[in-house]
Amino acid sequence: MKGVCKVCGCTMKNPCFSHRYGFCWWNDKEEDLCSHCATAAIRQDPTTIHCVHGLEFPVLTVHQPYALMLVKGFKKIEYRNWKLPKQYVGQRIFIHAGRDLHCTWNKHFSDEMPFVQSVGEAMADELSEMILGSVVFGESQGPFDGIKYGTPYKMYEWPVTDPIRLENPLKFIPGKQRIWKIQF
């Protein structure tokens, strides 16, 4: 029924019903979902993001190859020189692959393993400026002395759980600093 959320039954008159959603995978037709139910569905299965329109989601830009390592589950801790804001602890955050390779990637592999460096550069060319997937970050740990991480700054460790890689990354999206929002 048009104007009624398919999941919870709320209507457009109810304040939680604020968006119309498009052509969706679950039944190959347009459906109405309220913001709350659509957000919950995407947090459960981020691959449904392609069929939702009008919602904002948090995104973190990460240099390659670390962005891909996060969404594939190889990287268990994200290191930042700032604490994860409380409102994002335990929330699904999309991971955006930045345009450039991280400077430490070149420093660590340029002399010892040129092949690994060339693979990393090719990956950065193919998988940059796009949302690759999402993760859930836990409570920040720290601050720790940055010398341990090769930096003069204090560093925080963000534990990573529940990585999900999108089958079809969202391409050609310029990144931003810190956590930013994207609207679908």
Residue ranges of model-derived segments:
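Short, intrinsically disordered terminal segments enriched in charged and Pro/Gly residues
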Residues: 30, 40-46
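Short recognition patches in nucleic-acid-associated and regulatory proteins
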Residues: 2-28
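Generic secondary-structure boundary signal with a strong preference for alpha-helix termini
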Residues: 19-21, 34, 85
